[in-house]
């Protein structure tokens, strides 16, 4: 059966490898699919992650780095459950995350391991442990709750599924276990069914199970069913069963009958078993899926088998329900995600036709609303109706698939049934059944409502509408409107009867709802009429309605102007204003007229409203001049100002300041140009200067930047308004830096008497012209001098101020200024007063009044300049007596004492406050010795040096310098550029230093001589101090200095100094001597001070005499000395001597260097002695390691074994590696064996050719690297047995397999390699790489085993790699097989066709070519078969029929000249009605003269050149062929050609049929004439009947009468009269029935009460009885008897002839 006609369709939705899932992770433990929404894959390499695949977007997987043992996505939402084992325990940690919210919902640590888990509901996880089953809700904080313990039959089972029933009352756990010993290949299935209510379990044998709900007829509540499938082996027989059982039967209700059916497995699938079961709740079908990919489909209700097929070539390990489509998803080992769904178009025909199960077909069609059972349903309905089973017929009609029986005919059929007294009318049963099943259609709703309305049962209608049981229509609304307007409105709305809805809203005065509803449905009512209607009764409602219209999309349907006029016509000014203000808010240019209108009407009637509108500024497009005039008339002057645009108008209005708010007027000035604003201001000042000054000032303040400050100032000056100027500039002053502005403000303030403001500005402002302001204030002669004081004090006009105040006798202000304002300027005031010859008493009083606030220095300077210093004596003495320490006070006082020569030395030496430089400078010309005293007191070095040099006072200078002990001063006086240096040195050496008793002074002097680089002078100085028995003879530092200076300046004296001096720093001086290369002197110093190490270092490092050093070492016998000697010997390469010296020194500190040098010189015997000594002192890994290495180098292996057994800290691993690297394999073997480094030991044994031991060591090491090294060594040594042992441990690692294979192959060991790989197949850890590599080896070296290997292990091969190998080795048959296994059907087909002798096999090729994706390969296959296998080409074409372009196939065969060859194929595909196929077959039929098949082809398939074919065969020698030509002309509507051709062959029946079908009166009447002419009277009579509808009675009678054929026309005449009289009778009958209906209505009203009792049995609500039609029988006329044939004429069928009544 073709796949397209199969009842179940399969589709590959996705392949997991295509979205990056590695093949190794496509397993039961790594992949989960809890619903049709998500697939979850757990990856462990290259890093741990979880991949979530949303089935709505499968090509956009979500990958998250998560480490877990299992991951489950929630069936409904993005909630992920994770399970991971707690390290070091058997416990599992469970977590639940919300991926979208990125939050953890819950977590729990299970005390035992969870072996299986599953989402059993969207809110509940089922957890299965080794012994129990738990449920864990994701809601709240609850922990897992134990549900039941596992039964014994599930012990040691692998749990593969766990499910719960829809009501969560039943649970089922399924596991599988190894098969019985008699048949181990067949896996056992075990099931545990648990009842939550009864808390009981039942153990059963089953591989798969699923729950379902099913409604048993007669039971309102659904029953819970369980379906399970099992396959068991008993007594040598395999039994496969499907069971369907009800769980928890409901007492007193009909129960489900237990069903069971056989599962038929093909022989090739004897060991296959069910792995999953899904129940389609949409179609009530059971899907049983087996491991090897078989699908069984059964009906849930009857357990009837429907379909079986293999849906996957690879094992299926996971399924999930696809609830939305009534199918399921399945995932196989290859990673295909397959979707199985019901083929809705074919399943019913398949069940009814192929299975011949009509009842199941009907039930499934009703259940799933599926097509294909229409005829069966209609036939069944008619049978039930004929059997008067009206209830069953009603139920069948209600459940009919796709509503095929829900028609007016069915309603009429039930209406026509007579009602027996006391019984429920069938029509009521029908409607009741429909209501219980769902919703009525429009016709049914109308008919039922008509009954209800007639009986005034409005409440029934309301209930049905509320339950959505009726389909609303306009007709239904019209019917209901007669009894209830509200209900009718609801019906109109549901039926979208828009005009009726609008009319209803209008009647209810709900106009706002009209707009809302019209917008929703896109309807346009008569808005103007509605608005006028509302205006008459509700003006505010009209405003609201108009506003709602204005907000409609696309604008208001009624023009705003029209709406406004409607309001104004009724004098509704406020309403019109309200409307316009709302709609004109956008302020659009096109609304200018309306803006003007709303302002005009309000300026005339409600000026305050207009003022508010204008103030808001919401309009800008109205007629401004018109509105300006109206505003002026209404007294809205400020608005008129804003609207006028001409200066005269503005000037006229602006003077009305009494009626204009000042602030508004100020703001208006801001809208004018500066020129116009000035003009208006001038007018205002002219009209009322005093009254308008404040407004003008305010305007100037506000807009000074626009108007210009200068212009404003000129304006006020023009009107001489200093008050205005003062107020204007007062606000602007803080922003201006213009000196002129500040001056004018000072001037205006002064002239307006604002003295305090003048004082403030002169004090605070920084921008006025000081000179100009000073002059103005002096000229103004203000009574208050403070402004002038501010100016003069700030800008240093103090002398001018003093002169002004003194000359104007304002002495009080002078005292105030000096005492309070600025005492610091008192010296200037005093100087000016002295210049003005002011009395000294006033000046002294002024000075004494200020006292300590007075700055002394400038005061002294002012008095000194005028030779009036003595004036200050009293003032200065007063300050001193007050305790003043001011230097200037004491300087001045000192100068006065020096000038008066009043014991100046006492003052200079005792006064601590004067400035030595100032006073000393003052004394230099008067007395240099006083200057020296002053300078010495202040340590004024430079000044003192200068004055002593100038006056040759060198002794004073030398003493000062020595006492000073200042390095910089010494540097200066000892500088070679100092002309007086020699005189100073002489005085220092002869006088100053011998007099000194201070070591610090001596030290400073010596240091200064050293710094000045005067060594000879220094030696001279030091010899005098140190060697001539002075106080400093034994001074340690000076002795050091003397020797060091001699070393530097005169080395010949050094040895003498060493012998004569004893108190010097021997080590330091010795080092200096070494640096100065005075080695013997240094050696003497170190010996003198017993510094033997330094002494021997001088001999070794400087004298470079190892012999003298050894001799010295023997003399002193110190370890440290021997150590230095040993190090020197080591440096010189005397390794043995050095080692001996180190041993004498007992020195182990330099063992690293000794080891290095000993190894470089190969002195291992001595090194052993040294290391043994070192080991006694230090515990270093390096020492022990080097000792082992030294033993190995001198071949003392016994000592090595003894040493490593003793306690040691050697790094044995490092030593072993070093020995191995240097090929000391025996020693390395000892080390590696001791530390159990089996890997290194194995490699070492390989080097020693001890292969068996190497293998044993490698086994202990169990390292891939070690195995490889040993294996390769064994291969090289041809120890293939040992090599195979190693190789089996390597090839289980995927990454190392290829390396081993290449190593064997490069050395030609092909058989041994194959043997190794074959042995590897049986390994527990055998992987895909081994199977693949063996296949490649077979392909290269043992071709005969290749195919067997591929077939055995096709699922475990890396097929692409093996494909390349087979292609290289040209194994075409195997290559084809591999392509098929890898679903590379295009390549498989190409290979077969290119290498057909080896690769072609017909059945296989058919399977391949049916699955190829490249369309061109279909036609290549056709060419291939045409050339090589033409005898079976039709078999191939039938396989490809659904994929081929039939036209192209026909062209190929036509060009090849073998069109007849594919005749069977063309017949099979002719149903597609392809032109090329039709023409080719017709051509063949013509050639074969098979006119029957030709006519059949023409009838069934019209796509061909009809006229061309007719013209081709109209002259054929066979009559039947010519008849076909006439038939084609008839079909093509060429009636005349068809009739002419039939006439020619005397085919009169064909002529009549053609004329009848043409529908043309003329042709029919011409044919009558032809028969008359030919004398064919019988044909004439027959033609009258055949063309009855076309022949006019008068023409027929005329022809018959004229040609004496009335007898032959009489049957036609009788029929015509009967038909005519029947029409008349029908008209009379209609009139009588109309009269009866009037009487019947009257009778119905009387029968209402009696008929109401008929509603008792109606479900769910009662229905009124329909009016009973009259019982009418047939018309009394039977069908006409068939006319007997006339002689020589065939029987005449009644073409177009109506049935004749019997007479």
UniProtKB/Swiss-Prot annotation:
It is found in: Cytoplasmic vesicle membrane; Membrane, Coated pit. GO terms for molecular function: clathrin light chain binding; identical protein binding; mRNA binding; structural molecule activity. It is a peripheral membrane protein. Residues 315-343 are annotated as: WD40-like repeat 7. Residues 25-67 are annotated as: WD40-like repeat 1. GO terms for cellular component: chloroplast; clathrin coat of coated pit; clathrin coat of trans-Golgi network vesicle; clathrin complex; Golgi apparatus; plasma membrane; plasmodesma. CHCR repeats lie at residues 551-697, 700-842, 847-986, 993-1138, 1142-1283, 1288-1434, 1437-1580. Residues 68-113 are annotated as: WD40-like repeat 2. Residues 462-478 are annotated as: Binding site for the uncoating ATPase, involved in lattice disassembly. It comes from the Eukaryota. The keyword Repeat applies. Residues 1227-1536 are annotated as: Involved in binding clathrin light chain. Disruption phenotype: Defective in bulk endocytosis as well as in internalization of prominent plasma membrane proteins. Defects in constitutive endocytic recycling of PIN auxin transporters and their polar distribution in embryos and roots leading to altered auxin distribution patterns and associated auxin transport-related phenotypes. Defective in embryonic and postembryonic development. Its main location: membrane. Gene3D superfamilies: 1.25.40.730, Clathrin heavy-chain terminal domain, Tetratricopeptide repeat domain. The modification N-acetylalanine is found at residue 2. Residues 1564-1703 are annotated as: Trimerization. The keyword Acetylation applies. Residues 156-205 are annotated as: WD40-like repeat 4. Residues 537-1703 are annotated as: Heavy chain arm. Residues 114-155 are annotated as: WD40-like repeat 3. Belongs to the clathrin heavy chain family. Clathrin triskelions, composed of 3 heavy chains and 3 light chains, are the basic subunits of the clathrin coat. Interacts with CLC2 and TPLATE. Interacts with EDR4. The C-terminal third of the heavy chains forms the hub of the triskelion. This region contains the trimerization domain and the light-chain binding domain involved in the assembly of the clathrin lattice. This is Clathrin heavy chain 2. The lineage of its organism: Eukaryota, Viridiplantae, Streptophyta, Embryophyta, Tracheophyta. The gene is CHC2.
């Amino acid at each position: 059966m073709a796949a397209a006609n199969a009842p179940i369709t399969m589709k590959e939705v996705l392949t997991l490898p295509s979205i990056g899932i590695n093949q190794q992770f496509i397993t039961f433990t790594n992949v989960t699919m809890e619903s049709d929404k998500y697939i979850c894959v757990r990856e462990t390499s290259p890093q741990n992650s979880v991949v979530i695949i949303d089935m709505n977007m499968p090509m956009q997987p979500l990958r998250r780095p998560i480490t877990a043992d299992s991951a489950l996505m929630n069936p409904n939402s993005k909630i992920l459950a994770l399970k991971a084992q707690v390290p070091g325990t058997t416990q599992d940690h469970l977590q639940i995350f919300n991926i979208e919210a990125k939050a953890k919902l819950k977590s729990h640590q299970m005390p035992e391991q969870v072996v299986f888990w599953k989402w059993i509901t969207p809110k509940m996880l089922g957890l299965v442990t080794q012994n129990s089953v738990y449920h864990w809700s994701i809601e709240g904080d609850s922990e897992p709750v134990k549900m039941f313990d596992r039964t014994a039959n599930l012990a040691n089972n692998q749990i593969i599924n766990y499910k719960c029933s829809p009501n969560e009352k039943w649970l089922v756990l399924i596991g599988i276990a190894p098969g019985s010993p008699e048949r181990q290949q067949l896996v056992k299935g075990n099931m545990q069914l648990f009842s939550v209510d009864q808390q009981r379990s039942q153990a059963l044998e089953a591989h798969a199970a699923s729950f379902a709900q099913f409604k048993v007829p007669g039971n309102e509540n659904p029953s819970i069913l369980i379906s399970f499938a099992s396959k068991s082996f008993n007594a040598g027989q395999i039994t496969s069963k499907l069971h369907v059982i009800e769980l928890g039967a409901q007492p007193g209700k009909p129960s489900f009958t237990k069903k069971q059916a056989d599962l038929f497995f093909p022989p090739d699938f004897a060991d296959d078993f069910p792995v999953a079961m899904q129940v389609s709740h949409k179609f009530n079908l059971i899907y049983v899926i087996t491991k090897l990919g078989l699908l069984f489909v059964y009906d849930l209700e009857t357990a009837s088998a429907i379909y079986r097929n293999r849906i996957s070539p690879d094992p299926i390990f996971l399924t999930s329900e696809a609830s939305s489509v009534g199918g399921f998803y399945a995932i196989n080992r290859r990673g295909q995600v397959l979707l199985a769904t019901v083929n809705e178009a074919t399943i019913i025909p398949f069940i009814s036709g192929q299975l011949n199960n009509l009842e199941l077909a009907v039930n499934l069609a009703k259940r799933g609303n599926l097509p294909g059972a229409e005829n069966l349903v209609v036939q069944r309905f008619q049978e039930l109706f004929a059997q008067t089973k009206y209830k069953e017929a009603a139920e069948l009609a209600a459940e009919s698939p796709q509503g095929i029986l829900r028609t007016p005919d069915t309603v009429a059929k039930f209406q026509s049934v007579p009602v027996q007294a006391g019984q429920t009318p069938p029509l009521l049963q029908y409607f009741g059944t429909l209501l219980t099943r769902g919703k009525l259609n429009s016709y049914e709703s109308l008919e039922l409502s008509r009954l209800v309305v007639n009986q005034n049962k409005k409440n029934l209608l309301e209930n049905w509408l509320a339950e959505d049981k009726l389909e609303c229509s306009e007709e239904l609304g019209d019917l209901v409107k007669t009894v209830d307007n509200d209900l009718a409105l609801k019906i109109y709305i549901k039926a979208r009867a828009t005009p009726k809805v609008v009319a209803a809203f209008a009647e209810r005065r709900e106009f706002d709802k009209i707009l809302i509803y019209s917008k929703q449905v896109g309807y346009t009512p008569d808005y103007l009429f509605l608005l006028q209607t509302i205006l008459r009764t509700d003006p505010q409602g009209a405003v609201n309605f108009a506003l709602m219209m204005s907000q409609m999309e696309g604008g208001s349907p009624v023009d705003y102007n029209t709406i406004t006029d409607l309001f104004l016509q009724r004098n509704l000014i406020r309403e019109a204003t309200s409307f316009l203000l709302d709609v004109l808010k956008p302020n659009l240019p096109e609304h200018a007229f309306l803006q003007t209108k709303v302002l005009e009407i309000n300026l005339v009637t409600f000026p305050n409203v207009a003022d508010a509108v204008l103030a808001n500024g919401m309009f800008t497009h109205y007629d401004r001049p018109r509105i300006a005039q109206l505003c002026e008339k209404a007294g809205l002057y400020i608005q008129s100002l804003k609207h006028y645009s001409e200066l005269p108008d503005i000037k006229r209005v602006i003077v009305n300041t009494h009626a204009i708010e000042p602030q508004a007027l100020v703001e208006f000035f801001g809208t004018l140009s500066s020129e116009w604003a000035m003009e208006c201001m001038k007018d205002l000042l002219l009209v009322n200067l005093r009254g308008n000054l404040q407004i003008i000032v305010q305007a100037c303040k506000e807009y000074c930047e626009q108007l210009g400050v200068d212009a404003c100032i000129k304006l006020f000056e023009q009107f001489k308004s200093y008050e205005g100027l003062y107020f204007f500039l007062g606000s602007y002053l803080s922003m201006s830096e213009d000196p002129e502005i500040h001056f004018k403000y000072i001037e205006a303030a002064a002239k307006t008497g604002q003295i305090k403001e003048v004082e403030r500005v002169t004090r605070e402002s920084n921008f006025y012209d000081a000179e100009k302001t000073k002059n103005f204030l002096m000229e103004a002669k203000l009574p208050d001098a403070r402004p002038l004081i501010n100016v003069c004090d700030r800008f240093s006009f103090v002398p001018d101020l003093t002169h002004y105040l003194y000359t104007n006798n304002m002495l009080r202000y002078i005292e105030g200024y000096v005492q309070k304002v600025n005492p610091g300027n008192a010296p200037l005031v005093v100087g000016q007063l002295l210049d003005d010859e002011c009395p000294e008493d006033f000046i002294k009083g002024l000075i004494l009044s200020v006292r300590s606030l007075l700055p002394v220095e400038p005061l002294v300077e002012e008095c000194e300049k005028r030779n009036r210093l003595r004036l200050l004596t009293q003032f200065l003495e007063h300050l001193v007596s007050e305790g003043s320490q001011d230097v200037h006070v004491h300087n001045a006082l000192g100068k006065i004492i020096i000038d008066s020569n009043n014991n100046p030395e006492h003052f200079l030496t005792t006064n601590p406050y004067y400035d030595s430089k100032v006073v000393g400078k003052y004394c230099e010309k008067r007395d240099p010795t006083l200057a020296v005293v002053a300078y010495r007191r202040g340590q004024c070095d430079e000044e003192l040096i200068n004055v002593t040099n100038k006056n040759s006072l060198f002794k004073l200078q030398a003493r000062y310098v020595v006492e000073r002990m200042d390095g910089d001063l010494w540097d200066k006086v000892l500088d070679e550029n100092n002309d007086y240096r020699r005189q100073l040195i002489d005085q220092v050496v002869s006088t100053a230093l011998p007099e000194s008793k201070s070591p610090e002074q001596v030290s400073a002097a010596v240091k200064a001589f050293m710094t000045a680089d005067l060594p000879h002078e220094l030696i001279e100085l030091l010899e005098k101090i140190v060697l001539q028995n002075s106080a400093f003879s034994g001074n340690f530092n000076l002795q050091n200095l003397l020797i060091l200076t001699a070393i530097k300046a005169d080395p010949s004296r050094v040895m003498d100094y060493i012998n004569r001096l004893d108190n010097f720093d021997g080590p330091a001086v010795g080092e200096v001597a070494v640096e100065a290369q005075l080695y013997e002197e240094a050696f003497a110093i170190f010996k003198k001070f017993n510094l033997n190490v330094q002494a021997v270092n001088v001999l070794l490092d400087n004298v470079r005499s190892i012999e003298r050093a050894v001799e010295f070492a023997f003399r002193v016998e110190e370890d440290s000395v021997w150590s230095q000697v040993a190090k020197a010997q080591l440096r010189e390469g005397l390794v043995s001597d050095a080692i001996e010296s180190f041993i004498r020194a007992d020195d182990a500190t330099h063992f690293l260097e000794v080891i290095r040098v000993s190894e470089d010189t190969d002195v291992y015997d001595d090194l052993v002695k040294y290391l043994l000594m070192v080991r006694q002192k230090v515990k270093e890994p390096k020492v022990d390691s080097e000792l082992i290495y030294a033993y190995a180098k001198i071949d003392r292996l016994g000592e090595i074994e003894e040493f490593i057994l003793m306690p040691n800290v050697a790094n044995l691993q490092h030593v072993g590696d070093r020995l191995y690297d240097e090929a000391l394999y025996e020693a390395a073997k000892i080390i590696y064996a001791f530390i159990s480094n089996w890997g290194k030991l194995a490699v070492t044994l390989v080097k020693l050719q001890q292969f068996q031991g190497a293998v044993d060591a490698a086994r202990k090491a169990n390292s891939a690297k070690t195995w490889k090294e040993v294996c390769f060594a064994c291969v090289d040594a041809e120890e293939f047995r040992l090599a195979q042992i190693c190789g089996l441990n390597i090839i289980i690692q995927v990454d190392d397999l290829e390396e081993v294979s290449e190593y064997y192959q490069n050395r030609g060991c092909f058989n041994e390699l194959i043997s190794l790989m074959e042995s590897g197949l049986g390994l527990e850890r055998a992987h895909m790489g081994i199977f693949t590599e063996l296949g490649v080896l077979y392909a290269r070296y043992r071709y005969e085993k290749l195919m067997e290997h591929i077939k055995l292990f096709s699922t475990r091969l890396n097929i692409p790699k093996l494909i390349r190998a087979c292609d290289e080795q040209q194994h075409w048959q195997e290559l084809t097989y591999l392509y098929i296994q890898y679903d590379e059907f295009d390549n498989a087909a190409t290979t077969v066709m290119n290498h057909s002798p080896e690769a072609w096999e017909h059945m296989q090729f058919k399977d391949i070519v049916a699955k190829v994706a490249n369309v061109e390969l279909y036609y290549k296959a056709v060419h291939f078969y045409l050339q090589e296998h033409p005898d079976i080409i039709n078999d191939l074409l039938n396989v490809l029929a659904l994929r081929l372009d039939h036209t192209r196939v026909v062209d190929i065969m036509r060009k090849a000249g073998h069109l007849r060859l594919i005749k069977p194929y063309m017949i099979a595909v002719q149903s597609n009605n392809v032109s090329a196929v039709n023409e080719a077959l017709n051509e063949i039929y013509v050639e074969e003269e098979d006119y029957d098949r030709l006519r059949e082809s023409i009838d069934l398939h019209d796509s061909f050149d009809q006229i061309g074919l007719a013209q081709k065969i109209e002259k054929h020698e066979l009559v039947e062929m010519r008849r076909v030509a006439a038939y084609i002309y008839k079909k093509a509507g060429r009636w005349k050609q068809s009739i002419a051709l039939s006439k020619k062959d005397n085919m009169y029946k064909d002529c009549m049929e053609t004329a009848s079908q043409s529908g043309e009166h003329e042709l029919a009447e011409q044919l009558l004439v032809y028969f008359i002419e030919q004398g064919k009277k019988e044909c004439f009579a027959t033609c009258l009947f055949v063309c009855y509808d076309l022949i006019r009675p008068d023409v027929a009678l005329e022809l018959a009468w004229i040609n004496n054929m009335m007898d032959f026309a009489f049957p036609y005449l009788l029929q015509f009269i009967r038909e005519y009289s029947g029409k008349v009778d029908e008209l009379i009958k209609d009139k009588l029935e109309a009269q009866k209906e009037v009487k019947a209505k009257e009778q119905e009203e009387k029968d209402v009460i009696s008929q109401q009792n008929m509603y008792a049995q109606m479900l769910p609500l009662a229905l009124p009885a329909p009016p009973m039609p009259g019982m009418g029988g047939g018309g009394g006329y039977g069908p006409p008897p068939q006319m007997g044939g006339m002689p020589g004429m065939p029987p005449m069928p009644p073409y177009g002839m109506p049935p004749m009544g019997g007479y």
